[in-house]
Amino acid sequence: DTKELIHRRVLELQQKKKLTNYRLYTDLRLNPGNVNAWLKHNDSSKMSLDCARQIYKYAKSYPSVR
């Protein structure tokens, strides 16, 4: 499942780059409840594939912590 793969990658990037859920949904202007449901509880019913891709692209381009 594509969303499952994106979910795993986003979590890896969040850990590596110290990127919080708050930063994701605030900067991308997404619904906090849906983003948290997807990232914390892997509830993919709350996340469209387009939003998942948008989050992944943002996380990938987010600068790394030094």
Residue map of PLM features:
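A short, Lys/Arg-rich alpha-helix, primarily the initiator
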Residues: 1-18, 26
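Alpha-helix N-cap/helix-initiation sites
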Residues: 3, 21, 45-49
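Conserved hydrophobic/aromatic packing and binding residues within compact polymer-binding modules
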Residues: 10, 24-25, 35-38
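Residues within the helices of the helix-turn-helix
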Residues: 11, 22, 53
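DNA major-groove recognition helix of helix-turn-helix
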Residues: 14, 39-40, 51, 59
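Recognition helix of helix-turn-helix/homeodomain-like DNA-binding domains
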Residues: 29-47
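DNA major-groove recognition helix of helix-turn-helix/homeodomain DNA-binding modules
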Residues: 48-65
